[in-house]
Amino acid sequence: MMENNRNYLIAIALSVMVVLGWQFFYMNPRIEAQRQAEQAQQAQQAKTPATQATPGAAVNGALPGQTQASATTSREDAVAKSARVEINTEALSGSINLTGARLDDLRLKGYHETVDKTSPIITLLNPADTKDGYFAEIGFIGGEKSGSVPGPSTVWTVKDGQTLTETTPVTLTYTNETGLTFSRKISVDKHYMFTIEDTVANAGGADISLAPYGRVTRYNKPAVASTYVLHEGFIGVMGSGDGKFASVEAKYAAIEKENETNAKATGGWLGITDKYWAATLVPPQSLAYDSRFSHFTDGQARFQADYKNDPVTIAPGQSTTLKTLLFAGAKEVPVVDGYALDKSWFGQAFTNLFAGAKDTVQQYDIPRFDLLIDWGWFYFLTKPMFKLMDFFFRQVGNFGVAILLTTIAVKLLFFPLASKQYASMANMKRMQPKMEELKAKHGDDRMALQQAMMELYKTEKINPVAGCWPLLLQIPVFFALYKVIYITIEMRHAPFFGWIHDLSAPDPTSFVNLFGLLPFESPAMLHLGIWPIIMGITMFVQMRMNPTPPDPTQAMLFNWMPLVFTFMLGSFPAGLVIYWAWNNTLSVLQQSIIMKRHGVKIELFDNLKGLFQRKSAKTK
């Protein structure tokens, strides 16, 4: 049995090493290195003269420069000083700035800043001259014959509609001195997708060439939730023109260092993403374009994701229409998936498996738009985990209960492996007398003892590592669930029961202040809530199902492991801790049933009795 205990402890130790090692030896040094790099970059920028990286507006030139923001003002004043068209939909409120037809005022009605439903709703986009300027705009680059074309300073006129809703689009117009008339129809669905249709009519006497462009601009670098658990910053999917698409990501720090990255593409999309929100542009898919992620230090520092299409030519008396999509909102999985065109076999399989998930979302067939949500390298495991959890949620209406049901489903999936694990443990226990005889026979001759043990395993058809593999195989499941709880907006502010009001946040209670009975806040390093303690108890019970290892070092690990995990998971999302506690509970029940079926004594009560007897003896 000692051999099996050693395998069990090795599996748990590996789990701890993976979690702690990843945190302390991978994440923390890189976070610190990034912080130092950012400080050095900022110091260098302070010494470097400001440069304007967007020269004039030739048809084959760069994008027109941004109008520099004036002194920072309040958001209310910035919105009030410009003529605007109101936005009022089921999901959104805000307005479109008629100067530049810029979307720079957008709030998300369905999301609050805190779990308190009376707290302010989330503000996503802000005017340029506010502290957190963040906006999207679309324009044109003209040539010598085109005259002035729509850009950042163009003042548009409202032709139709005063309020943009799901059912009432608005139309803006602008006519320049050469006879070009620009008509912009803006519509929005009931979620977060804006459709911008630009019709350009040439009433002049010469061919006119225009290059459409679009950009998402963000002033100042936002605070990111994490550096390596998920991606926040620039994101896009670029098409090569032959039906193939590649995902592109860039951190803010990387673009600060490089100033900009460029790529030529046909089809796809690009923008800026946060943990839960995003603003992205989908250029006209039939035109090739130059994409760019950039960082400017001229005046107020800003980050920008932009594209410039190849020029289109409009003959005299003719017109052309170009369609651009703009996503600005919450990264809800069904909505994002509904907008996406996923040609991979994996994506098609899930589309068929969960038919109906897209039915409530208007179809846009945006190439691989589902990658807007960072499912990570284990996409094939993380997304199915969420889909299963979401399925249960739609049945019971509570994500906490959905986590419990998902755990049961995972347990059923791993049941054959778990059965082998516990059967192996039972067989190892039956072989314990023979193993003790071999130890007595060979004494300190480890080589001879090992060979004899292997012969015994072979004769009895026992695999000594069979009990280890099921535990190791569940580690990716743990990380997949962690990723789901951490990145999906569906988990944000999702309640369970009692004191758990946000499954994506740590348990808010703490034993230091007696779980809220004492009137003070506990130190962060000592913050240990009720659910982590419950998890520690279930892990303690699970480990006591097996005999205590005779080796002192193994016995020490055996005793300390639940306590280490309890404190380690104290800062993890409550949903993950609930999963682990429930998983331990199911494992205890499962192990009890299987061991009883094999006629093996369950060691739980004997171990507990022995533990307390040893402690009692030490105190005498």
Swiss-Prot record:
GO terms for biological process: protein insertion into membrane; protein transport. Pfam families: 60KD_IMP, YidC_periplas. It is a multi-pass membrane protein. The keyword Transport applies. The chain crosses the membrane at residues 7-27, 399-419, 469-489, 514-534, 560-580. Signal peptide: none annotated. It comes from the Bacteria. GO terms for cellular component: plasma membrane. One of its GO terms (molecular function) is membrane insertase activity. Keywords: Cell inner membrane, Cell membrane, Chaperone, Membrane, Protein transport, Transmembrane, Transmembrane helix, Transport. Residues 37-58 have a biased composition (Low complexity). HAMAP family: YidC_type1. NCBIfam families: PRK01318.1-4, yidC_nterm, yidC_oxa1_cterm. Interacts with the Sec translocase complex via SecD. Specifically interacts with transmembrane segments of nascent integral membrane proteins during membrane integration. This is Membrane protein insertase YidC. It comes from Allorhizobium ampelinum (strain ATCC BAA-846 / DSM 112012 / S4) (Agrobacterium vitis (strain S4)). The lineage of its organism: Bacteria, Pseudomonadati, Pseudomonadota, Alphaproteobacteria, Hyphomicrobiales. The gene is yidC.
